[in-house]
Amino acid sequence: MALIIGNKTPFVQQPPSPWTSLTKAHTQNTGSDGFLFVSFIMSNSRGYSGCTYGGQPMTLIKTQNFGGLQQRWACYGLLNPPTGNNNIVVSFSGSVFSPVSMFAVSFTGSSGAGVFA
């Protein structure tokens, strides 16, 4: 089965007030061997403590701190996420005052994706 790119959810926003988490709706495609990829970048003045989709914890795939740019980036993945419309929730380790950019993309046909490295 071929890997098929499904729904995408882009998000960029300056917090209207300090955030301790970010919640954004995303629709996971219906199909076998689903996968959800979420990436976000934010100021490195705060960290993050996790990411969930539909209440299921996602696996941290990669994180990077760009000290010179004063930004931190992370990406999370979830094999066989619940289909349909659910919330992505990114939890922060403290209040976030700076803009946060997030991008989520759904896949089907991800059989053989294996373990995150």
Predicted regions and their residues:
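Function-critical acidic carboxylates
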Residues: M1-A117
